[in-house]
Amino acid sequence: MFKIMNAHSLEMRKELGAYYTPSALSQVMSDWAIRRPTDKILEPSFGGCGFLESCEKSLMEIGCINPMENLFGVDVDQKAFDTLKKKYGHLLIKKHFILSDFINVFPKDFGIEDFEVIIGNPPYISMHNMSYEQRKSCEKVFADSPFKTKTLGRNASLWGFFLLHALSFIRENGRIAWVLPSSFLNAYYAK
């Protein structure tokens, strides 16, 4: 599994901001976030599918008969989709998974209004390492968000914009479980 999850070179993983989460941690997070067998769950940067696997297990443990009906995901990387197909093959529901930058996706793209759970490990790319298109998309997320703060701006990392954008996907009383960097605790834009 490690080879599948790390299908990219170290250089490419850094470019994508991809850092994979240990399965024990993703399982603890899934078990905390998922409360009902009917919860709709979004993983906005599913990469090696670790969180999808943990969510599938959590759903089955609480009585969900077909967990793939509840799982949705986005990833910008075709290799993530290759991994998804290898792991889930015929169980995949195509409209549940979108090949795109999460910043450019909206709940309506999945055909539903919102999610009970958003879970994952967002990409860690500093603003100055983002492409022009990514920066423009992030600026639009910031401008359109009812949750924006005055501090999120030019110094923010992509994970900050992912979090801000994810808030428009979450159902009232839903849960967001994300692996965030320690800068979340002290970055000015994270306040």
Which role fits each region the language model picked out?
Residues 71-73, 96, 118:
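Generic beta-strand hydrophobic packing signal
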Residues 92-102:
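Conserved SAM-binding strand-loop segment of SAM-dependent methyltransferases
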